[in-house]
Amino acid sequence: MSMLKMDSHIHSEYSPDSNSKIDDILERARQENIDIIAISDHNTVDGTSEVIRKTRNTDILAIPSIEISSTQGHILGFGCEENIPKDLSPQDTIDRIHDSGGLAIIPHPYCFYRHGLLHNTDYKDLKIDAIETKNARFIVGYCNRKAKKLSKKENIPALGASDAHYWKFVGDCFSLIDAEKDIDSVLKAIVKGKVEAHGKGTSNILLAKYLFEKNILMKL
């Protein structure tokens, strides 16, 4: 079985802080030779529903996902097809994810300025399934290094993801996963730790350019 390339944390125009079209995201994913993607929009599955429709019978597998705002920070409901309420406690959010058949993955765990859950909460109090140890949206990399250290110490499965809010950043960080190209196999492989985090940080110059252009466009 060959390793598959996956970007598990991408935002689309259904997130309030992104204007990326699903078609542009898919085009970029193909340019980056990505096999598996997940649109993980803030508190809505509208984007993930669209990408699943558009990738049926194609070369890309779309995993349903959502980034949920708990009271203490963000949590990915990876594999969740339905909305999960925001502003629940972290463990209540995780319980809802598990009840939906998904995995609870902590994005940018220690990034305090981006609602990193483990900046506010001890992971030992939570039934998490995996954490991001390579999130492409960083400035100096300290938060990623801290997450990687925790993953190794506590044997928590580690993922890489672009957290792209602009389609050109898709694939900057990614995972290589030892799985068949179907949703159930991917979820099981993550739980078993058959996944590796890879990639680089999104260029801060390009990120600043995107934020400037986005701010201008939103005022038009």
Across the structure, where does each feature detected by a protein language model lie?
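Short beta-strand/loop segments at the ligand-binding rim of alpha/beta enzyme cores
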Residues: M3, I97-I105
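Conserved beta-strand positions in the central sheet of alpha/beta enzyme cores
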Residues: A38-D41, I105-I106, E132
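Aromatic-lined carbohydrate-recognition surfaces of secreted/lumenal glycan-active proteins
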Residues: I105-Y113
